[in-house]
């Protein structure tokens, strides 16, 4: 065999696929079956205002924050007795300046707490492992009738039930 023939033969052969990946549905529909080895994004750093009195408007908080920079994300959460506001900025140094200025600041009769927190990304729903699917993910995969054990009726109970039936007819 010449070198050209060997090279031609090598090029014509298909790449070997692992047996455990051969029959998965993912390869047939064009998605990746295994989690990729790409590094995860670092967690997002956001700014959280807590214990904000209910009578403080969204616009007031936005104006306080816009003194430093325009937020790229903002959201407000109303709780029973206070509010929480979350902001995100392009530049993390802006958040530190906002914390320095507004942390433990009195606002409309309440003391506002400002802190920087890291928000972890939620795992992608499509990337559940098969082991999670076998367990049922706590979603009640089995019906409730599996949980109760029906005890056999005792002889005395059956006799009493039969007597009641016979008396009623």
Curated annotation (Swiss-Prot):
Domain RRM: 45-119
Membrane-spanning residues: none
Region (Disordered): 119-169
MF-aspect GO terms: DNA binding; RNA binding
GO cellular component, one term: nucleus
Family under the similarity heading: Belongs to the YRA1 family.
Keyword vocabulary terms for this entry: DNA-binding, mRNA transport, Nucleus, RNA-binding, Transport
Protein's GO biological process: mRNA transport
CDD domains: RRM_YRA2 (cd12295)
Name of the protein in question: RNA annealing protein YRA2
Subcellular location(s) of the protein: Nucleus
Major localization listed first in the record, in broad terms: nucleus
Species in which this protein is naturally found: Zygosaccharomyces rouxii (strain ATCC 2623 / CBS 732 / NBRC 1130 / NCYC 568 / NRRL Y-229)
InterPro entries xrefs: FoP_C, Nucleotide-bd_a/b_plait_sf, RBD_domain_sf, RRM_dom, Yra2_RRM
Pfam families per record: FoP_duplication (PF13865)
Subunit structure: Associates with mRNPs.
Function: Involved in export of poly(A) mRNAs from the nucleus. Recruited to the coding sequences as well as poly-A sites of active genes.
